[in-house]
Amino acid sequence: MRRQLRSRRAPAFPYGYGYRLDDQDEVNQNYLADEEEEAEEARVMVVPDLEEEEKEEEEEKEEDEKEEEESHHQDTRSAWWQKLQIVNEYLWDPEKRMSLARTGQSLSLLLVIYFFFYASLAAVITLCMYTLFLTISPYVPTFTERVKPPGVMIRPFAHSLNFNFNVSEPDTWQHYVISLNGFLQGYNDSLQEEMNVDCPPGQYFIQDGDEDEDKKACQFKRSFLKNCSGLEDPTFGYSTGQPCILLKMNRIVGFRPELGDPVKVSCKVQRGDENDIRSISYYPESASFDLRYYPYYGKLTHVNYTSPLVAMHFTDVVKNQAVPVQCQLKGKGIINDVINDRFVGRVIFTLNIET
């Protein structure tokens, strides 16, 4: 600063003038003050100029970005428009008068070729199906060598085959009673006497004639189940802790018990103490499916056929604990030990009677 003052000091006046040294200092101070004011004004002017330049640069960047986005959208639109034009020209080209890159004559020829091709294919398939159906009888299965031995089912329905109920609480067993009553409606004595015939027991009921001829069915009356018929005890023993469970074999067309011996039913404790079940009564008393209900001729001709039943009356079962029960079919040709299928020749369920 002192150097600037020295360089800008006012010129020396000749001796002829009457100025004093104090006047020279005052002049130098005035120069210094003027320079400071100019510097301050320059600083004040420079700051707004820089801010304005930054704002202008930001605005220019934003404008450039907008222009880039608009150009990108325009490029995208133009690309889509070009694709649509290509598709439109492929579907119909008015200049060449072509559709799908083919003339009308070539398209007509192509349609004719495809028509005859698919018509021939449909005719071959129809002929094969017709020939196949000629060899299949709707009344008798063609292939029976792979049919498994009969499986079994029980009534009433129970969730997971677990019969859990409390004797003193009717709400816990009433649904079993309703299920049994509904299932046995088709076995009512009056209905069986009206629809089916009274067949002699102990022998097959073989009916000759055409396979499409209606077949007769033997009576299986509800009264055959005695204490488990619901006629004498409407609760089927559930109110006294002596439940009845009905078992039937699945129907198989043409099935006959081998050697002329009826298939029997046997129940026991599956695992655990065998004394958990001390007494079981079977109805009919033979605990078997009589031969007169076989063979079965199929639902198309054996319309009124009624599957025979065996009722198990569990009269003395340990209470207040779960008892696993297994009921098996016994007879020649019957398989009842398949591990992977618990319903082939046997059924397993649980009794849990609370008091």
Swiss-Prot record:
Region (Disordered) location: 35-76
Membrane topology, as annotated: Single-pass type II membrane protein
Regions of this protein lying in the Nuclear compartment: 1-108
TM region(s), chain numbering: 109-129
Annotated compartments: Nucleus inner membrane
Highest rank taxon of the organism: Eukaryota
Compositionally biased residues, Acidic residues: 49-68
Keyword entries, A-Z: Membrane, Nucleus, Signal-anchor, Transcription, Transcription regulation, Transmembrane, Transmembrane helix
Main location: nucleus
InterPro entries for the chain: Na/K_ATPase_sub_beta, Na/K_ATPase_sub_beta_sf
Pfam families for this protein: Na_K-ATPase
Presence of the UniProt keyword Transferase in the record: no
Tissue spec. comment: Expressed in skeletal muscle (at protein level). Expressed during postnatal development in skeletal muscle and heart.
Ranges of the Perinuclear space topological domain: 130-355
GO cellular component, one term: sodium:potassium-exchanging ATPase complex
Keyword Magnesium recorded: no
Biological processes per GO annotation: potassium ion transport; regulation of DNA-templated transcription; sodium ion transport
Family the entry assigns: Belongs to the X(+)/potassium ATPases subunit beta family.
Oligomeric form and interacting partners: Associates with a SMAD7-transcriptional complex. Interacts with SNW1 and TOR1AIP1. Does not associate with known Na,K-ATPase alpha-subunits.
Function comment: May act as a transcriptional coregulator during muscle development through its interaction with SNW1. Has lost its ancestral function as a Na,K-ATPase beta-subunit.
UniProt xrefs under NCBIfam families: Na_K_ATPase_bet
Name this protein carries in UniProt: Protein ATP1B4
Organism (species): Sus scrofa (Pig)
Lineage: Eukaryota, Metazoa, Chordata, Craniata, Vertebrata
This protein's encoding gene: ATP1B4
